[in-house]
Amino acid sequence: MLRKVFYISDGTAITAEVFGHAVLSQFPLEFDALTIPFVETEAKAEAVKAQINDCFITTGERPLVFHSIVKPEIRDVIYSSEGLDYDFLNTFVAPLEKQLGIAATPAMHRTHGKANEGYEARIDAINYAMENDDGQTMKHMDKADLILLGVSRCGKTPSSLYLSMQFGIKAANYPFTEDDMDNLKLPDALKRNKGKLFGLTIDPERLHEIRHSRMSNSRYSSLRQCRMEVKEVEMMYQKERIPFVNTTNHSVEEIATKILEITGLKRHMF
């Protein structure tokens, strides 16, 4: 039976999940996780406590409880459960109060709510990424923070959306297709924004697998075509001195982190 894990918050529970996943990923084990957001009252906290206690009675193992709860009275209810408690906010707040010489002033949902100035940056960036996905339009490239390039199915769209959703970065993306390969060059709109360009590439064998799952037995998905496109695009990156990374076997989170590290782009939100 898998060890039970609870991610609990009086907000979205995103913080509890992120920290919890980061900690648990250090162990070569699988877990049975349950996320419970918006535990905003003592009554809700008591109901969650009952779930935790029932799990302990059923399994004989104390559930792992990761939480980021602002209100002390709600937090105390969770503390009193039979779970093994990991309180991220309280762990860091008390030492910081001492170092900064000021008492914390907790605010509900401050880290993810609409009151956060980064909220508008997130929405604007998501809208921009969707409107400027896959070269749909070249009219607004000047407004981009970043323009991702690459062959079809190398990870441009998920990377653009992740950067916009997670960091508020306006990321457009432009595809190089089979028709471009005979005379591969940068369109004028991209030349004008050369400092914003960043290339993605991928191992041809992996690209072949991805395309084959969508359009099997086509020229588009053939290994020969994949090898040719990747080779041509990488040569263009080198000729134009466009930085690029290989996305093969990397998660979208890892790709985004590499892009930010190489480009030095600043996050617009946290």
Swiss-Prot record:
Q: Which residues bind ADP?
A: G150, V151, S152, R153, C154, G155, K156, T157
Fetch the InterPro entries from UniProt.
Kinase-pyrophosphorylase, PSRP
User: Which EC class heads this enzyme's classification?
Assistant: transferase
Q: Say if the entry is tagged with keyword Isomerase.
A: no
Which Enzyme Commission numbers does its entry carry?
2.7.11.33, 2.7.4.28
Keyword list, A-Z: Kinase, Nucleotide-binding, Serine/threonine-protein kinase, Transferase
Q: Does the keyword Kinase apply?
A: yes
A Pfam family that the UniProt record links to this protein: Kinase-PPPase
Question: Which GO terms fall under molecular function for this chain's record?
Answer: ADP binding; ATP binding; phosphotransferase activity, phosphate group as acceptor; protein serine/threonine kinase activity
Instruction: From the UniProt record, list the reaction(s) this protein catalyses.
Output: [pyruvate, water dikinase] + ADP = [pyruvate, water dikinase]-phosphate + AMP + H(+); [pyruvate, water dikinase]-phosphate + phosphate + H(+) = [pyruvate, water dikinase] + diphosphate
Protein function: Bifunctional serine/threonine kinase and phosphorylase involved in the regulation of the phosphoenolpyruvate synthase (PEPS) by catalyzing its phosphorylation/dephosphorylation.
- UniProt family annotation: Belongs to the pyruvate, phosphate/water dikinase regulatory protein family. PSRP subfamily.
- Alphabetical list of NCBIfam families matching this protein: PRK05339.1
Q: What protein name is recorded for this chain?
A: Putative phosphoenolpyruvate synthase regulatory protein
Record lineage: Bacteria, Pseudomonadati, Pseudomonadota, Gammaproteobacteria, Alteromonadales
